[in-house]
């Protein structure tokens, strides 16, 4: 029987990444914040659901703020200082997440809206009657 080898230390090495890109996907139900380096490798991520919110509270601006703060904290630990922000989606947490990144100490150099707009593609869902 083979002997088990015990690993020591963490699997991820601490990289020093000064510049990065923050992808904020904000839907009506949740907000996901991913922070990558300039080549697209994910350094840290967080979401409203991962921050402890459940159900309808995941779609609130406060949930987006806490998700952005958590992701920014981990990125700052890896040495990130300057970021570009790419925002996607129509959700309520867009501006709050950007403000939380700025307050956390990251310098924002660019904010771009990359929400996909159809050139009359798929049929829209039917209107809700409440």
Curated annotation (Swiss-Prot):
The keyword Ribonucleoprotein applies. GO terms for biological process: translation. Keywords: Ribonucleoprotein, Ribosomal protein, RNA-binding, rRNA-binding. GO terms for cellular component: ribonucleoprotein complex; ribosome. One of its GO terms (molecular function) is rRNA binding. The keyword Transport does not apply. Signal peptide: none annotated. Pfam families: Ribosomal_S11 (PF00411). InterPro entries: Ribosomal_uS11 (IPR001971), Ribosomal_uS11_bac-type (IPR019981), Ribosomal_uS11_CS (IPR018102), Ribosomal_uS11_sf (IPR036967). Belongs to the universal ribosomal protein uS11 family. Part of the 30S ribosomal subunit. Interacts with proteins S7 and S18. Binds to IF-3. Located on the platform of the 30S subunit, it bridges several disparate RNA helices of the 16S rRNA. Forms part of the Shine-Dalgarno cleft in the 70S ribosome. This is Small ribosomal subunit protein uS11. It comes from Prochlorococcus marinus (strain MIT 9312). The lineage of its organism: Bacteria, Bacillati, Cyanobacteriota, Cyanophyceae, Synechococcales.
């Amino acid at each position: 029987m083979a002997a088990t080898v015990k690993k020591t230390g963490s699997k991820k090495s601490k990289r020093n990444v000064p510049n990065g890109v923050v992808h904020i996907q904000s839907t009506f139900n949740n907000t996901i914040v991913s922070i990558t380096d300039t080549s697209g490798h994910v350094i840290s991520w967080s979401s409203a659901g991962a921050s402890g919110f459940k159900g309808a509270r995941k779609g609130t601006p406060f949930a987006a703020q806490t998700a952005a703060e958590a992701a920014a904290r981990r990125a700052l630990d890896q040495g990130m200082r300057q970021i570009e922000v790419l925002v996607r989606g129509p959700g309520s947490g867009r501006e709050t997440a950007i403000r939380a990144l700025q307050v956390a100490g990251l310098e924002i150099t660019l904010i771009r809206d990359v929400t996909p707009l159809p050139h009359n593609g798929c049929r829209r869902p039917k209107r809700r009657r409440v």
